[in-house]
Amino acid sequence: MSNKQAVLKLISKRWISTVQRADFKLNSEALHSNATVFSMIQPTGCFHLGNYLGATRVWTDLCELKQPGQELIFGVADLHAITVPKPDGEMFRKFRHEAVASILAVGVDPEKASVIYQSAIPQHSELHWLLSTLASMGLLNRMTQWKSKSNIKQSTNGDYLVNDSDVGKVRLGLFSYPVLQAADILLYKSTHVPVGDDQSQHLELTRHLAEKFNKMYKKNFFPKPVTMLAQTKKVLSLSTPEKKMSKSDPNHDSVIFLNDEPKAIQKKIRKALTDSISDRFYYDPVERPGVSNLINIVSGIQRKSIEDVVEDVSRFNNYRDFKDYVSEVIIEELKGPRTEFEKYINEPTYLHSVVESGMRKAREKAAKNLADIHKIMGF
């Protein structure tokens, strides 16, 4: 077995014991007494349903459970966002603003959690450089996100078909994205990181870099952060349920936003791609991806198992009734966040004060931890 194969096998083995799937509703046993929770989301404007169910509702649950001695840091990953170029500065600034409004709208309490802009805390970038001296090209090449964002072709079984020409076109920032993500997490000595399924591979790399640093400098400095996966499976596009819901989808009817009006939500769900296999509604992501996506959405919102939702919708025998039920569930869930978003988006001074307060606390911790890292490394 080569050294590279041994490292990859070790990472995979340890990953199993450092991932926890969040319950439908977190309880006080989810975190230990001095836990530090860290998570960020890219600024793409007002959050959509996938952002909400796949990430930020867990943040809200954690705020409700926070105990003295625990720390929550949630942020806007604006440095990560520019790994895909954002040439319109004014629009990007607007998206950053809307991201903060969305974080508060879903229920994150700024009295319990620090809300930050990644770019405003320079220690993120410096630790990125320090960790990049430990990260091998082989491990980074194994990451899938740079391949998906570079539109690398995939085989029928989902493997990426990478050639030298493809690699030569990849921007360095996108390729090293996972190292910056590791720096974001380790800078605060985070113990728990809520992420979606598509980010779990990056948390493997984060733990690997933490262990490598600790072993190299013979210090137990960085904890191995636990991956907290949301209970809801990935929310998919309403029109193309083979890919995840995304604001960049050219078909706006594919995405449900927090600030969508009830009539818009109902229209989008009625137009959602389903099938003609049966007028009985059951969960089968391969044969019935559209129907399964709608069942998954209801499961996430209601915090019920897929099996329970399938039983609930068994009373419907036509698509209109089924889809109207899904619409009602979504409309009711987003009623509060929609109202709160409209309130916060019109309070820029308050949003600025929330971020400034959060960054003051985060900068203090970031500065202390980076100073300790400098001392360990001999700077």
UniProtKB/Swiss-Prot annotation:
Q: What is its EC number?
A: 6.1.1.2
Answer whether the UniProt record assigns the keyword Nucleus to this protein: no
> Per the record's keyword annotation, is tRNA processing included, yes or no?
no
> Where can the motif 'KMSKS' region be found?
244-248
Localization recorded for this chain is: Mitochondrion matrix
Its cellular-component GO annotations read: mitochondrial matrix; mitochondrion
The primary location reported for this protein is mitochondrion
Amino-acid positions noted as binding L-tryptophan in the UniProt annotation, renumbered to this chain: D184
A Gene Ontology annotation in the biological process aspect, one of them, is: mitochondrial tryptophanyl-tRNA aminoacylation
Reaction(s) this enzyme catalyzes, per UniProt: tRNA(Trp) + L-tryptophan + ATP = L-tryptophyl-tRNA(Trp) + AMP + diphosphate + H(+)
Which keywords are on file for this protein?
Aminoacyl-tRNA synthetase, ATP-binding, Ligase, Mitochondrion, Nucleotide-binding, Protein biosynthesis
EC class of the enzyme, as a word: ligase
Q: Which residues bind ATP?
A: Q42, H48, L49, G50, N51, G196, D197, D198, V235, K244, M245, S246, K247, S248
GO molecular function annotations of the record: ATP binding; tryptophan-tRNA ligase activity
Motif 'HIGH' region mapped to chain: 43-51
Q: Name one Pfam family in it.
A: tRNA-synt_1b
User: Subunit arrangement?
Assistant: Homodimer.
* Functional summary from the UniProt entry: Mitochondrial aminoacyl-tRNA synthetase that catalyzes the attachment of tryptophan to tRNA(Trp).
Additional detail: Present with 672 molecules/cell in log phase SD medium.
What the record says about family reads:
Belongs to the class-I aminoacyl-tRNA synthetase family.
In Swiss-Prot or TrEMBL terms, this protein is called Tryptophan--tRNA ligase, mitochondrial
Q: What is the lineage of its organism?
A: Eukaryota, Fungi, Dikarya, Ascomycota, Saccharomycotina
